[in-house]
């Protein structure tokens, strides 16, 4: 039987976690990045399709390649983050379905409908980005997800000649709490949910 996690874990993962814009000068190791993926990969996706592909940018050279794609409001926070993850989706994710979903011919569901393939890849890679954020929080890291960037520039700079397309960016590191804004409100249950 499943058991609820502790109140402390809920605080770490949700209620006390914040989106960070400033970072401490504490590096994030490659081993930690591997740990993050080892956790996030278990999050569910449609037919186990797992379309997300992630580039972890850790070097000054990588950040300079990314710089022209960033909006002005996201520039400094990204250049100073220890890691920036480009969460992309593989437009031909279905080629891995014989391995990932061997129960039937799931590949044909998507090869016969390019629109379904694109919708599935984008939706599920977005879900996987959320799993990455939760994995970061679980390992004591902070994040700053962003959609304010030039996707075409990122695709040209990092994914030219491939089947990958960028979805969003996530800055990862140890946040500087002195640079946090006041916590913004969230919608109440009554405002966001319905019961039928």
From Swiss-Prot:
User: What domain of life?
Assistant: Bacteria
Q: Which CDD domains match?
A: RutE-like (cd02148)
Sorted keywords for this record are: Flavoprotein, FMN, NAD, NADP, Oxidoreductase
Q: Which GO terms describe its molecular function?
A: 3-hydroxypropionate dehydrogenase (NADP+) activity
Q: What class of enzyme is it?
A: oxidoreductase
Enzyme Commission designation? 1.1.1.298
Which cofactors must be present for this protein to function? FMN
Question: Catalyses which reaction?
Answer: 3-hydroxypropanoate + NADP(+) = 3-oxopropanoate + NADPH + H(+)
Q: Which Pfam families match?
A: Nitroreductase
- Its Gene Ontology biological processes? nitrogen utilization; uracil catabolic process
Q: Which InterPro entries match?
A: Nitroreductase, Nitroreductase-like, Nitroreductase_HadB/RutE, RutE-like
Question: Its biological function?
Answer: May reduce toxic product malonic semialdehyde to 3-hydroxypropionic acid, which is excreted.
Query: Which family would the database say this protein is a member of?
Result: Belongs to the nitroreductase family. HadB/RutE subfamily.
Q: Which PANTHER family does the protein's record reference? A: MALONIC SEMIALDEHYDE REDUCTASE RUTE-RELATED
The identity of this protein, by name, is: Probable malonic semialdehyde reductase RutE
Q: Which organism is it from?
A: Escherichia coli O157:H7
